[in-house]
């Protein structure tokens, strides 16, 4: 019934099983086993990172639909769903990496034709999966690198979308979690302002190059030791 998504039959089963503790626990057990089985297949299969996230979101929406439509938004069922997903996504760091990759691909796209409501909906779906990660610092480490690359490349960056995601992460994990991201944002804005001031100054007149610099706060940006050593070897 769960696999077939038969809401009527699931509602009947829920109404019968919820009356007895042992039966209700059996229902929760079967639901958890279904989520773990389906989710584990996604994590273990050789699927692309963005496909993994899309399918994980679909799985969550599917079981959440069962909980809300067939099981009267039962809080115990909600806890069962949460614990099952936590078991799936915390086996290793694959899901954390996949979320960062998915967000990177999404945020690189042009958001001019997407309204605020649609942007919020898409980000919220990702945040739902993010909540299941127990070690969110792993996600933060991957995300900082991805975020820094997007800022430095400045290719098709949608500032509104980037800001919206940082705010959502801040709501979920607090100010300390997003401190580096906010500092990096400020660094880029300050760098852009300084470059514009220089280009408008008499000093820049007659230059045959497009002069641009990035001023970054020490200790806040990712530090690639290999890259640093490479540049130190240049005479």
Where are the regions a protein language model picked out?
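Eukaryotic scaffold/interaction segments
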Residues: 1-235
